[in-house]
Design a protein with these regions (language model features):
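A short, charge-rich alpha-helical start-of-domain segment used by transcription regulators
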Residues: 2-27, 40
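C-terminal flanking helix
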Residues: 22, 26, 47, 119, ...
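Residues within helix-turn-helix
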Residues: 37, 136, 147
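Hydrophobic positions on the alpha-helical face of helix-turn-helix-like DNA-binding modules
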Residues: 46, 70, 125-126, 138-139, ...
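Arg/Lys-rich amphipathic alpha helix in sigma70-family domain 2
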Residues: 56-58, 69-89, 104
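Amphipathic alpha-helical segment used for protein-protein interaction
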Residues: 96-127, 131-143, 161
């Protein structure tokens, strides 16, 4: 196959990823961002990492699983930089959820405030669980067993409950 064909195939696959998975990428970045600037930076980092590693996708898992893994790893890697800039207003305070009732909006803001306090791996687990991702797929994304996924999610939910009662 010619270099031109490989390049065309790579670009087509990347365009497809961007078109189909932008909401997923945005959701993961939102969970790790502390400000709107961090959110935008994370999205750019994720897209750059997807572009550079797209040739490494070998169909051993679903495309969405691979994208989640790249997104989460990128966000965790960048979280130290974001913590240094924690004086910014939190993203949950900056972004408005337009189509929600005031009560529901406040519940969502409180949930995101609590999730922001979790460590990066806990954030990834709870985000995937909230997204309705199957335990098997969460295990593939996080590199842990299905049983361990259940145990860790239970612990994170307990931790969030305790944090909300403080």
């Amino acid at each position: 196959m010619s270099t031109k064909s490989n390049t065309d195939l790579r670009e087509a696959m990347f365009r497809d990823v961007v078109e189909r998975y932008t909401p997923l990428i945005a959701k993961v970045c939102y969970m790790y961002a502390r400000s709107l600037d961090d959110f935008n930076d994370l999205q750019q980092e994720v897209l750059a990492n997807l572009w550079t590693s797209i040739d490494g996708f070998a169909n051993r898992s679903k495309l969405s699983t691979w994208i989640y893994r790249v997104c989460i790893n990128t966000c965790i890697t960048c979280s130290a930089r974001m913590r240094r800039h924690s004086e910014h207003e939190s993203l949950s305070e900056q972004m408005s959820l337009i189509d929600e009732s005031p009560e529901r909006l406040e519940q969502l803001r409180e949930m995101y405030r609590l999730i922001e306090r979790l460590d990066p791996l806990e954030k990834a687990l709870i985000m995937l669980w909230l997204d309705g991702t199957a335990y098997d797929e969460i295990g593939q994304i996080m590199g842990i067993t299905k049983a361990n996924v259940g145990i860790r999610i239970h612990r994170v939910k307990d931790k969030l409950t305790k944090m909300s009662n403080e």
